[in-house]
């Protein structure tokens, strides 16, 4: 399933047991006696008839045609086979929605049902609906009565009881969901409305500025030197793996200073880490330097292994996974402290960084940590979120087309030179292709961080940012305790977290560069383009902080590295309101663990649900 960089896909609301119970619903699989698999000829009376599989289908390559050329009495119908293999299992007392596509040259047709009584066997149940004549493909749907007691299976199809023909295809049968129980608050009224933050009793043992939720449910926390020159000089580089279920940390060996590297989760769950800190600045000499090394972290062995080198150094690079599993990386500082203009591409097929001559280059300087979002058509959207840059070519926003090797400027981003340390997120559902950019400041002039948000529709013919709602204000610590924000005071260092209810939690931040933490959190609803203030993290979360969704639906926040060089090792956990409204549905089965884009997948849960999200 795609990671956060790929956004969130909305699954159309379906009942908890919404799965097509009809086997071979489009007649594509052949059976015996000239009939498709799991379908049989049925009927009675004095009439002349034919059953045929025809190419004139609604979808696929086949449809079923039943024709009566003479009739005195009786009917003919293609029914789901009355067998334990083919007849759908039903539950007494439940109702089922039946659907099909049809064409008909006769008004004498009906959807007919039979049921299997556990004592008496198969018997006629009811005719549910007469189908109107239709020259073109027409959809018909009907809901069954409650299944009678003692019934364990049903079968059904279209009866033809007059001269003419009925051609049918694409049958569906889904159990009607039970009524959704009303939400029941399981905490205080305020917590049920705004959620709750808890500070964990155990601290994060490393100074991690990078966080990755792994495919096994654990969290990789990468520190490297943790922005500590003392650790760097001593060669002390660390990472930790946090287990949210056990509440434990495991510190693991880390081969290089991955402080301010780039990273991305690969399709198989491993984590690709690129570049990092080769050297701290020297007074009167060089600045930060980025190295060319790259590593892969394996969640199974919890170890790093080296890949081939990048073509250039990249301290503070971006990393975006493409649709084919390749990774493209831009920006950051080179080994000589200058800005890198080299694009890098990781080949999923070759499991290596490609040599320079195999990578398209525009020789653009994208700044540091440029926020690159994969678009549905394969291009990349640079949102304008970045760090450490005033008026550099990497400010503003643009669309980058790797295949065409072009960069197209995108207008509309407010105060583009004051979006340092802002956040950008592909809003749910991802297929809507809208991006929200939140807050920011400027490391050079260091003004008060702003409350600005901007929204862009990347599916528009000529995409451009439009003004979004302002970030709600909270409290700020200006050095003498928390006071209410005033005027246009906003925040930089914002974290934006996609939630499974389709909303986005924005949390954390600071009013100035590495100073004055802001205590505010709110939910952004993409459906209404509004913010709703919620409970705020009691811990400072500024520079080198992160917040992310845990597999159980809670949000974890960690880190803060103010200008005095200290580190906040406290970890906060946010419980959103949706976890405080009654018993949670549980996924009981998933057919396939690996999904292809466009697949139809079946997930079973233990209680009625309204919708599901892929994150």
Kindly label every feature range from the protein language model.
Residues 4, 25, 150, 593-594:
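Compositionally biased, intrinsically disordered low-complexity segments
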Residues 1-18:
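Secretory targeting and sorting signals
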Residues 18-186:
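Extracellular and organelle-lumenal recognition/adhesion modules and their flexible linkers in secreted
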Residues 5, 36, 148, 177, ...:
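Alpha-helix initiation/capping motif
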Residues 181-615:
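Kelch-like beta-propeller repeat domains
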Residues 2-3, 158, 302:
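Short, functionally important structural connectors and interaction interfaces within domains
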